[in-house]
Design a protein with these regions (language model features):
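Glycine-rich oxoanion-binding loops at beta->alpha junctions
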Residues: 2, 48-101, 108-109, 141-148, ...
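N-terminal phosphate-binding or glycine-rich loops at protein starts, especially the Walker A/P-loop
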Residues: 2-49
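Short, ordered loop/turn segments at secondary-structure junctions
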Residues: 13-16, 36, 41-46, 76-77, ...
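Short Gly/Thr/Asp-enriched flexible loops that form oxyanion-binding sites at enzyme active sites
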Residues: 22-27, 108-121, 181
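Accessory alpha-helical/coil subdomains and C-terminal extensions
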Residues: 38, 103-105, 115, 122, ...
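Short beta-strand elements at the ligand-binding edges of bilobed clamshell
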Residues: 136-146, 260-266
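C-terminal non-catalytic interaction/assembly regions of soluble proteins
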Residues: 231-234, 239-323
Length: 323
């Protein structure tokens, strides 16, 4: 017999991503429409362990759909990685009458949800990360906005790079995954895209390509560098020293996490948030919602975490042929 759900908790965990507020709003209002109570858990799993738990109603999420960041705040929590921390979290949920939790975050957040599910707290995960590095889904909340933010910034860097006939290295977020770099590289028509999944650490070869392009008459050169490759400032110095071409590095940093979410992030996050509540009301647990092959679907968290993600090879190939 399915466990009856009366009160649903919602939290955001790990790095913030534009669209998280749209997801929170959808969870709250969809739950209320089904006669459920909602409690917001502030600062992720750290807030759960500290019992930073607040009642939420429709007004709690008014005028939040267009806001970046997360109204519940977020944090990373080492204590929750331990079995003791997880047990404490489950007991706190029961103490506050929380039957189920919607967890918005990445793979690490899903691992926490997985542990809570095993301890009797029904959980649904929503993919919230600007990095698009969750294998079970083609879309993650915040990726679209982050790409648009980076793309617009890179356009501006290209303007000045063209004026000064420079080589410009623009570093975007993505420690273990180069999806922002790949998408922006194509969107901005970059001459070079450096991905952690593909970079061979051959700075000499990169310098040769920059020099060769200048020899062919190319007056500026845009390199999009994922932070997982990094060392942008050092690369710029090496390129300039070897070629004589003025080279500057720009690190976009945390601006990619901020800003009002795009239409796509608002709509997809809303659908995912509502779907999470629907699944919980059906008695489902230990699931993660994904957008796969054009459809919103759900996977067992264990299955989702076991999946591996690879770079879209065709996108990477054409990024080189279209230079």
């Amino acid at each position: 017999m399915a466990k009856e759900i009366n009160t649903i908790g919602v939290l955001t965990s790990g790095g913030d991503a534009p669209g998280m507020n749209a997801a929170i709003r959808a969870v709250v209002r969809q739950a209320l429409s089904k006669g459920k109570k909602v409690k917001g858990i502030k600062r992720g799993y750290a807030g759960l362990l500290n019992e930073e738990i607040v009642d939420m109603d429709s007004k709690s999420v008014s005028d939040t759909i267009s806001r970046g960041g997360t109204i519940l705040q977020t944090a990373r929590c080492k204590e929750f990685v331990t079995a003791e921390g997880q047990q404490k979290g489950a007991e706190i949920c029961k103490k506050h009458g929380i039957d189920a939790i919607v967890v918005i975050g990445g793979d690490g957040s899903f691992q926490g949800a997985q542990k809570l599910a095993a301890l009797g707290i029904n959980t649904i995960g929503l993919p919230g990360t600007i990095d698009l590095d969750i294998a079970c889904t083609d879309y993650t909340i915040g990726f679209d906005t982050a790409c648009n933010t980076a793309m617009e910034a890179i356009d501006k860097v290209r303007d000045t790079s063209t004026s000064h006939e420079r080589c410009s290295i623009i570093e975007v977020m993505g420690r273990g995954a180069g999806y922002i770099a790949l998408w922006c590289g194509l969107a901005n028509g970059a001459e070079e895209i450096l991905l952690p999944e593909k970079y061979d650490n051959s700075l000499k070869a990169l310098i040769e390509r920059v020099a060769h392009a200048r020899g062919l008459g190319k007056q500026h050169y845009i390199i999009i560098n994922a932070e997982g490759v990094g060392h942008s400032q050092e690369m710029a110095k090496e390129i300039e020293a070897a070629t004589g071409i003025e080279t500057r590095a720009t690190i976009l940093g945390h601006m990619q996490r901020g800003g009002s979410p795009s239409c796509k992030d608002r709509v997809y996050a809303t659908i995912m948030g509502a779907m999470a509540v629907d699944l919980l009301c059906e008695g489902k647990s230990n699931r993660v919602i994904a957008h796969k092959d054009g459809n919103f679907v759900d996977f067992d968290i264990d299955e989702a975490l076991a999946m591996k993600k690879s770079v879209a090879e065709y996108m990477y190939d054409i990024s080189k042929s279209l230079v």
